[in-house]
């Protein structure tokens, strides 16, 4: 496995590229970190070889939300509904740059996330 860090726009990306060609690509949106804990957990679980692209430095309450939602508490921030703005960046810039860096063509591309990133993955 090779690990490569790169940026697209304001985003920090970490690609854990599979040693074998033509392995699936999983895109994981992170609130914090580079996904190293996720990759370690996958290894511990004896996961099949895959490419993992971790995307960080997101504007979490904007990029991951499809619609506006007010704050849940006085200390919270609103969700501002920027998923429609972020999705084209993911599809036209981030994914092509990640695919350039992996071996072969991924037979599947999946998207994963937790919390608001899980909502975005379903969106």
Question: Where do the protein language model's features map onto the residues?
Answer:
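Alpha/beta-hydrolase fold nucleophile elbow
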Residues: 102-114
């Amino acid at each position: 496995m090779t690990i490569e860090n790169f940026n697209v726009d304001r985003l920090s990306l970490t690609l854990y590229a599979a040693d074998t060609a033509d392995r699936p690509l999983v895109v994981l949106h992170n609130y914090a970190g580079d996904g190293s804990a996720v990759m370690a957990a996958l290894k511990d679980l004896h996961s099949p070889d895959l490419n993992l692209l971790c995307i960080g430095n997101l504007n979490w309450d904007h990029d991951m939300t499809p619609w506006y939602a007010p704050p849940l508490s006085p200390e919270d921030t609103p969700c501002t509904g920027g998923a429609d703005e972020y999705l084209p960046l993911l599809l036209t810039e981030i994914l092509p740059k990640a695919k350039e860096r992996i071996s072969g063509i991924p037979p599947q591309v999946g998207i994963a996330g937790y919390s608001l990133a899980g909502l975005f993955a379903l969106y």
